[in-house]
Amino acid sequence: MVDHNQKLLQELLKKPGNNVCADCGSQGPDWASYNLGIFICMRCASIHRGMGAHISKVKHLDLDRWEDSQVQRMKEVGNVAAKNKYEERVPPCYRRPTKNDPQVLIEQWIRAKYEREEFCHPERQSYLSGTMVGFLMKRGKEDSRYQLRKFVLNENEDTLKYQHASDGCSRASGCLGRIFDHLRLKNLGRLRYHVKENKEPKGVLKLSELNVSFAPSKIGHMNSMQLTFLKDGSTRHIYVYHEDPEVINCWYTAIRCAKLHLLQVAFPSTPQSDLILRLPKDFAREGWLWKTGPRPSDVHRRRWFTLDTRKLMYHDEPLDAYPKGEIFIGHESNGYQIKVSNTGNGCKEARFPFHLVTPERTFCLAATTHEDRAGWLAVIQQALKRPLTPQDSTIEATLVRKRTTSNSISIFSGR
């Protein structure tokens, strides 16, 4: 039998804003933080519980017993009022998570709101400064080992640099517990541990051309990112992680904020809302597909495909530093299209073929399941219909120039 307080809670759920999770926006929240006065989903409730009862006191709407004072608090606040308070000064560059986003993004969003109160106190948003210095574990280009590297972000120079740390600090287990990143140093006011590093950077990445995405499932670490950029006309991937989820999220946000500021300088008359749409996005889709060359005698090869906005890249393995090939997907009005093939292709694993048609050639691809093919067709079709941006045109010109000037290694090869 439903008691009086539970009936009141169900009525409160019908008020505007209360019918979705206050943190991730998922429908039908069945939990609440009664001291904060918000309705939340089960996933976010577990994060609230992890912050401790001194920050958030969590109860199930139906399974727990509610006191009158707790219900009154829910009535006084609610999701809309709580958002107005705890999200008052969210920077435009900050990525607001949704229910399908990585755990680290949702968790740090919640902790930033209620634990650190970053959006009530803008001075705590150090990722807006345009500079950041710290250490991340980086995967080797030629091997799978992760080594400690110093990273330096400088918005004024439009660069993200990284360089070797000393051999004595090459393992996460020993050094990451002793190294204080930029955010920690600002609070401590002094550096207790020093790390020697080479003066010359090992790599210099252009922030304005850099894409960054969380990659926990691919890298196998909850607090990990993939950095993607063009190097000598080809795409380069860098994989990094940090043991502290707050640190990796701050790096992610600092890169987004720096990129937005650079876009505002480059396109001063473009509305900020349009520029935000150009900030780094997660890959539209990744996964295994079968690929074959244009000749009937060509064999099917299993490749890891990644769709990054308009670049469809394929690799031998998911964590390769470079793709084996890259296909630019232009607008459908320029001769690009996707076709479903229902004919057999001679490969029992590649049961669901489809063709990506470009002005230069047709790429013969295949998925293992009907559902997987449908997923790829959907995201590629979206890319075909989307108008090209100036960045898209730059990438297209770079890839075409690479294709026409390189005879030994072609990014449009049949590999």
Label for each model-derived stretch:
Residues M1-G17, C93-Y94, E107, Y114-C120, ...:
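Long, non-globular segments of proteins
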Residues M1-L13, M42-S126:
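Cys/His-rich, Zn2+-coordinating zinc-finger modules
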Residues D3, E11-N18, Y34-N35, R65, ...:
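Intrinsic disorder
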Residues C21-C24, C41:
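Short cysteine-rich clusters marking metal-coordination/redox-active sites
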Residues Q27-L36:
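Canonical RING-type zinc finger of E3 ubiquitin-protein ligases
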Residues A112-S129, N154-T235, Y241-L277, D282, D308-T362, A383-E396, ...:
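Pleckstrin homology
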Residues L128-T131, K259-Y322, F328-I329, S333-K348, ...:
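Disordered regulatory linkers adjacent to lipid/PI-binding modules
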